[in-house]
Amino acid sequence: MDLRTALQTFESTRRLLELCSNRTSFLWRWLFGTPLSRLVRQVKLEYEKDFERILDQCPGVFESLELGYHKVFEEKIVKELDFSSPGRAVAAVAFASYLLDRWNTRTHLSPGYQMDYISLNLWKFWLRRRVYNYSRGLPQLGPAAPLARQGSQQEEQQQRQEEEQVQEEMRSGLDPPTEN
């Protein structure tokens, strides 16, 4: 199973995250897991300290998720995920799995909600990035040709501004005001 297939649908993205998380036993992962899920799990375990340092730079992420404020998570975590190459995409999925494990230890929300929320954000961001690359004529992430980082910083900045405009239009009004 390649990475593009694993992120193609919400269900497959959710299954991949579930197989990589700590809530899946070793035996279940070994019997029913895919090589990709084992790879993502291995990356998650190897880079655990780096992921922890990243989370230390974003204080209040889990507290805001507990209160139902998702803007902090979407702006500080999801927008910084990188799918420009297969290795970076695996690292992004590993980081999402790490977030799921950390959120599990600190919450009163149901495990299904947590899994759905992180899977949905990962899947939506991957789709947005894929559509953006397709509209710009950039190669897609796939087994034949890894996506090389192309385009200037100006294009990336323009894309972020477009995403911010879309996010502002879609806000439900539940998020607290942000400090600039």
UniProtKB/Swiss-Prot annotation:
Q: Where is this region: Disordered?
A: 142-180
Composition bias (Basic and acidic residues) maps to: 157-172
Q: Which UniProt keywords apply?
A: Early protein, Host-virus interaction, Inhibition of host apoptosis by viral BCL2-like protein, Modulation of host cell apoptosis by virus
Q: Which Pfam families match?
A: Adeno_E1B_19K
SUPFAM superfamilies, A to Z:
Bcl-2 inhibitors of programmed cell death
Taxonomically, the superkingdom here is Viruses
Entry keyword annotation includes Signal: no
Q: Which InterPro entries match?
A: Adenovir_t-Ag_E1B_19kDa, Bcl-2-like_sf, Bcl2-like
Q: Name one GO biological process term.
A: symbiont-mediated suppression of host apoptosis
What family classification does the UniProt entry report for this protein?
A: Belongs to the adenoviridae E1B 19 kDa protein family.
Name the chain's protein: E1B protein, small T-antigen
* Annotated organism of origin: Simian adenovirus serotype 7
